UniProtKB/Swiss-Prot annotation:
The gene is serA. The active site is at R232, E261, H279. The lineage of its organism: Bacteria, Bacillati, Actinomycetota, Actinomycetes, Mycobacteriales. One of its GO terms (biological process) is L-serine biosynthetic process. This is D-3-phosphoglycerate dehydrogenase. InterPro entries: ACT-like_dom_sf, ACT_dom, ASB_dom_sf, D-2-hydroxyacid_DH, D-isomer_2_OHA_DH_cat_dom, D-isomer_DH_CS, D-isomer_DH_CS1, D-isomer_DH_NAD-bd. It comes from Mycobacterium leprae (strain TN). It comes from the Bacteria. Its EC number is 1.1.1.95, 1.1.1.399. One of its GO terms (molecular function) is NAD binding.
Length: 528
């Protein structure tokens, strides 16, 4: 069998290739060369890039086999995420690969600005020894304002606190209780401006945050404040900051990012009190290596059909360690629902009960859709394209939660309703410390069977000797029954049997079973 092709379009560390493993074929292409890229992508199952290669709609259209685009870094400016989503292509980045490097660089700028390191260095290199010109300011005992408490902002806050500073922060999306856990005083933006001796910005750039530190904001700061921006260019108005430094209101500043990059001309460059670097926040050997290995792991997971935590175009909410083990089980429940349905359902609902209901479980809706469509769609069904497939085929999907779960700590029910009103309902749970996947209910009938391997599901008219007839026919065909579960209908003469087998059932044996027990439904379902 041919190995999936991973196309690397930019320079990446050798550790990235090693992390991809030996179950893929790695190819290289000069990604910035458009002609070469378009010639190479048709055979690619995965495309790895950094910032030099542009992955737009044209590239995606030329890659019919493509399952994932992986950006070895944080930014995604060079990847058309919307076009990828429309084609069902997963897009991932490495959001945590550079967070330590970025946090350390912000601290380096803050320290350099507070102690006039760059000025003193230039003076001494000019053969001038004049200590009195470079009197700095301590961080100890000061108030440091962190604007944005994301991953990097939290790291900066923790490190600044170690200097003996009092840390305050502004972030409208962080709960006060969470800030308190971090030992940080949360407040409004204006209050932070008025109180902080140092301000370090750690926000994403959005229409709402662009120009956040402008002339008006700077006027609200304490005289002698020191400002650092190592997050995104354009968050700080560079002209307004330069004016504030010249006036003496802002003591010093440190910037690693600029509104337009590459940037070789700025009013800030004329000011000795301002320390500038050319967007070096992620420029460490460790960050670059980590970015490559992180996206390599995402590629490995995607090509194996598994959930990819760092996917940016999966509308499934945050997937934490409590929810992640349920993804595979719920996908299998979707497969079983499809097998027991006479037609593609008009609606699919996922109901989560018990302890799991308190988590963000939106991703389980996508898992159920993946299972449902995996048996009826020839192409790969992913967390990305499953919602689009449902919309195209008129299948509505919802997820609900409830606290009641009398027999299990948590249960997930997947319910499909056909256009004629007929219902198929499968429930499953994770059992014991090993989180064994189990089917616990089929159409209202209680079961207790592991959700694994080859399974034979039969609905038939209950009659004496039916199970013996089924076993005899399977045994004669050399098919071994590993486990069995039988449940009678609560109303009427019907029964449902679920058998786990060691192999598939030949077509003629299926027909013989249907005839022998008057089965009105027989399906073989692979839950491997």
């Amino acid at each position: 069998m041919d190995l999936p092709v991973v196309l690397i379009a930019d320079k990446l560390a050798q550790s990235t290739v090693a992390a991809l493993g030996d179950q893929v074929e790695v190819r290289w292409v000069d990604g910035p060369d458009r002609t070469k890229l378009l010639a190479a992508v048709p055979e690619a199952d995965a495309l790895l890039v950094r910032s030099a290669t542009t992955v737009d709609a044209e590239v995606l259209a030329a890659a019919p086999k493509l399952k994932i685009v992986a950006r070895a870094g944080v930014g995604l400016d060079n990847v058309d995420v919307d076009a990828a989503t429309a084609r069902g292509v997963l897009v991932v980045n490495a959001p945590t690969s550079n967070i330590h490097s970025a946090a350390e660089h912000a601290l380096a700028l803050l320290l350099a600005a507070s102690r006039q390191i760059a000025e003193a260095d230039a003076s001494l290199r000019a053969h001038i020894w004049k200590r009195s010109s470079f009197s700095g300011t301590e961080i100890f005992g000061k108030t440091v304002g962190v604007v944005g408490l994301g991953r990097i902002g939290q790291l900066v806050a923790a490190r600044i606190a170690a200097f003996g500073a009092h840390v305050i922060a502004y972030d409208p999306y962080v709960a006060p209780a969470r800030a308190a856990q971090l030992g940080i005083e949360l407040m409004s933006f204006d209050d932070l401006l008025a109180r902080a001796d140092f301000i370090s910005v750690h926000l994403p750039k959005t229409p709402e945050t662009a120009g956040l530190i402008d002339k008006e904001a700077l006027a609200k700061t304490k005289p002698g404040v020191i400002i650092v921006n190592a997050a995104r260019g354009g968050l700080v108005d560079e002209v307004a900051l330069a004016d504030a430094v010249r006036s003496g209101h802002v003591r010093a500043a440190g910037l690693d990012v600029f509104a337009t990059e590459p940037c070789t001309d700025s009013p800030l460059f004329e000011l000795s009190q301002v320390v500038v670097t050319p967007h070096l926040g992620a420029s460490t050997a460790e960050a670059q290596d980590r970015a490559g290995t992180d996206v390599a792991e995402s590629v490995r997971l995607a090509l194996a059909g598994e959930f990819v935590p760092d996917a940016v175009n999966v509308d499934g909410g945050v997937v934490n360690e409590e929810v992640a083990p349920w993804l595979d089980l719920v996908c299998k429940l979707g497969v079983l629902v499809a097998a027991l349905s006479d037609e593609l359902p008009a609606s699919l609902s996922v109901h989560v009960r018990g302890e799991l209901a308190s988590e963000d479980v939106e991703i389980l809706r996508l898992s159920a859709l993946r299972g449902l469509f995996s048996t009826v769609i020839e192409d790969a069904v992913t967390f990305v394209n499953a919602p689009a497939l449902a919309a195209e085929r008129g299948v509505s999907a919802e997820i609900t939660t409830g606290s009641e779960s009398p027999n299990h700590r948590s249960v997930v029910d997947v319910r499909a309703v056909a256009s004629d009103g007929s219902v198929v309902n499968i429930a499953g749970t994770l059992s014991g410390p090993q989180l064994v996947q189990k089917i616990v209910q089929v159409n209202g009938r209680n079961f207790d069977l592991r959700a694994q391997g080859m399974n034979l599901v039969i609905r038939y008219v209950d009659q004496p000797g039916a199970l013996g007839k089924i076993g005899t026919l399977l045994g004669a065909a050399g098919v071994n029954i590993q486990a069995a579960q039988l449940s009678e209908d609560t109303e009427g003469p019907g029964a449902t049997i679920l058998l786990r087998l060691d192999q598939d059932v030949p077509g003629d044996v299926r027909s013989a079973i249907v005839a022998a027990v008057s089965a009105n439904k027989l399906e073989v379902v692979n839950l491997s």
